[in-house]
């Protein structure tokens, strides 16, 4: 089931990741149609959306990454998120810097609970991104 702490952001990714870590397979059909109301809960200019996206993603990575990767990736994310907050402030307003900062504060405050939610087995490797985030922020991938 969905992690109730992930209100409206990244809950489906977390669920699929946990299912994979539990040995389940994820299937899809290209014939299905999904209608998504972008910004239906919070629009992209809303700092609360930024907060939820950053906080939920940090928690999701801690819960699902192999232990040996989690520390290094989260440390790297701390640095990247600083740059991302400046970018978001430029694009959507200064309150987004505070939203990213508070996402990190709340993530670290709830660290024991996130660690307790880790499963016994994390699949490694199961995906490959090859600098996807850099391509996105440099404008070549949207």
Feature locations, PLM:
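Intrinsic disorder/low-structure terminal segments
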Residues: 5, 106, 133-136
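A short, conserved alpha-helix in the catalytic core of glycosyltransferases
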Residues: 1-33
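Anionic, Ser/Thr-rich low-complexity intrinsically disordered regions
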Residues: 120-142
């Amino acid at each position: 089931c969905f992690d109730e702490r992930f209100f409206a952001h990244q809950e489906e990714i977390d669920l699929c990741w946990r299912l994979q870590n539990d040995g389940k397979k994820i299937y899809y059909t290209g014939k299905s149609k999904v209608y998504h109301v972008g910004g239906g809960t919070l629009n992209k200019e809303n700092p609360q959306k930024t907060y939820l996206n950053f906080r939920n993603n940090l928690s999701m990575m801690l819960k699902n990454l192999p232990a040996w990767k989690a520390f290094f990736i989260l440390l790297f994310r701390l640095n990247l998120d600083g740059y991302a907050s400046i970018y978001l402030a430029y694009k959507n307003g200064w309150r987004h810097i505070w939203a990213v900062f508070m996402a990190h504060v709340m993530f670290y405050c709830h660290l024991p609970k996130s660690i307790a939610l880790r499963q016994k087995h994390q699949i490694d490797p199961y995906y490959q991104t090859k600098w996807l985030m850099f391509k996105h922020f440099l404008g070549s991938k949207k």
